[in-house]
Amino acid sequence: MDKQRIFEVLITNICEVLPELDGHRFEPEDQLVELGADSVDRAEIITMVLEDLSLKIPRIELSGVKNIGELAEVLYDKVQSA
């Protein structure tokens, strides 16, 4: 799975949790908080993405990411090492 596909999985789940963002032009620099995701929304998005990618990683490993591009990068690295 390539980085672009992981980014697409991330966007799909963001739009499912935050349907008001459907049609938004997502950029790697976008931050979930700035997009309107509260802590519960962010946890739900992460859980859904991890399930879609069949990953089991501690959430703490994702806590340092600053934007959705960095999140996709970390997830890509985890998929490659799984």
Curated annotation (Swiss-Prot):
Where does the record place it? Cytoplasm
Which cellular component, as a GO term, is one annotated location?
cytosol
Q: Post-translation: what modifications? A: 4'-phosphopantetheine is transferred from CoA to a specific serine of apo-ACP by sfp.
**Keywords, sorted A to Z:** Antibiotic biosynthesis, Cytoplasm, Phosphopantetheine, Phosphoprotein
Q: Is Cytoplasm among the key words of this record?
A: yes
Q: What PROSITE patterns has UniProt attached to this entry?
A: CARRIER
Entry-linked NCBIfam families: PRK07117.1 (NF005502)
Protein name stated in the entry: Polyketide biosynthesis acyl-carrier-protein AcpK
**The species this protein was found in:** Bacillus subtilis (strain 168)
